[in-house]
Amino acid sequence: MQVFTGTDKVKRGLAQMLKGGVIMDVTNAEQAEIAEEAGAVAVMALERVPADIRAQGGVARMADPKKIKEIMSAVSIPVMAKVRIGHFVEAQILEALGVDFIDESEVLTPADEKYHINKHLFKVPFVCGARDLGEALRRIAEGAAMIRTKGEAGTGNVVEAVRHMRQIMDEIRALALLPDEELVAKAKELGAPLELVIETKKLGRLPVVNFAAGGIATPADAALMMHLGADGVFVGSGIFKSKDPRKRARAIVLAVTYYDDPYVLAEISEDLGEPMPGIDVRKLSETELLQVRGW
């Protein structure tokens, strides 16, 4: 049977291959090599990690194509890159560069406050963030092949990632108990297509892989998110803003694999050096929150 590249089935299948793994933010080829050596299943190429974007402010855009190509040349694992919400030209550029996945990310400054990218128009699979089931299903309806919790990137504080993962999982469990007669009304409430609501109820999970992201800084954080139902984790600032990135990267990869073994977790959490300085999310103003970007 002939398989056509770029179909939803193929794109979702590519994302499935990353299940159970760790995807790490990197800003140069050296960091990408450290991530690959540590066992990352993919790297996210970007100009600045979320902690620096938060600290420095300004408009955060797609990374320089030269930097992305350098990272792609340095590693054999898949390379992802971020685009601004709604900026389909940035996405076209990344597809032309040959990246393996595109993240339409709230971490970058949104380019369009009305529309997200129509991801069905691209052959490359997309990753998108979500805080709840409705948001996740709307992104999947637009063509996303992978969902991740938004969390609150660049804080080193896992509380929002926990909140978003619990919210999505709780809504899926509630959906499973809903009579079929109420699904049309539920789809309208979620702002999502009925067929995706039906599929989610039938599967008892999202139709695509759902990774955890936003504030994961320690092996324990990564293991916690796996316990809550994540298919894998993204780690942004938590690795390369720590004292010993190489050791912490390896520990987080092992934590995702052995998340259900506290003895292994205790061993790998030992002597990692200082983690990244964290931010109390409660002290952030509404304008400082990244998770509220998108709809």
UniProtKB/Swiss-Prot annotation:
Gene3D superfamilies: Aldolase class I. One of its GO terms (biological process) is pyridoxal phosphate biosynthetic process. This is Pyridoxal 5'-phosphate synthase subunit PdxS. It comes from Dictyoglomus thermophilum (strain ATCC 35947 / DSM 3960 / H-6-12). It comes from the Bacteria. InterPro entries: Aldolase_TIM (IPR013785), PdxS/SNZ (IPR001852), PdxS/SNZ_N (IPR033755), RibuloseP-bd_barrel (IPR011060). The gene is pdxS. Belongs to the PdxS/SNZ family. Pathway: Cofactor biosynthesis; pyridoxal 5'-phosphate biosynthesis. Keywords: Lyase, Pyridoxal phosphate, Schiff base. The active site is at residue 82. D-glyceraldehyde 3-phosphate binds at residue 166. In the presence of PdxT, forms a dodecamer of heterodimers. It catalyses: aldehydo-D-ribose 5-phosphate + D-glyceraldehyde 3-phosphate + L-glutamine = pyridoxal 5'-phosphate + L-glutamate + phosphate + 3 H2O + H(+). It is an enzyme of class 4 (lyase). Catalyzes the formation of pyridoxal 5'-phosphate from ribose 5-phosphate (RBP), glyceraldehyde 3-phosphate (G3P) and ammonia. The ammonia is provided by the PdxT subunit. Can also use ribulose 5-phosphate and dihydroxyacetone phosphate as substrates, resulting from enzyme-catalyzed isomerization of RBP and G3P, respectively.
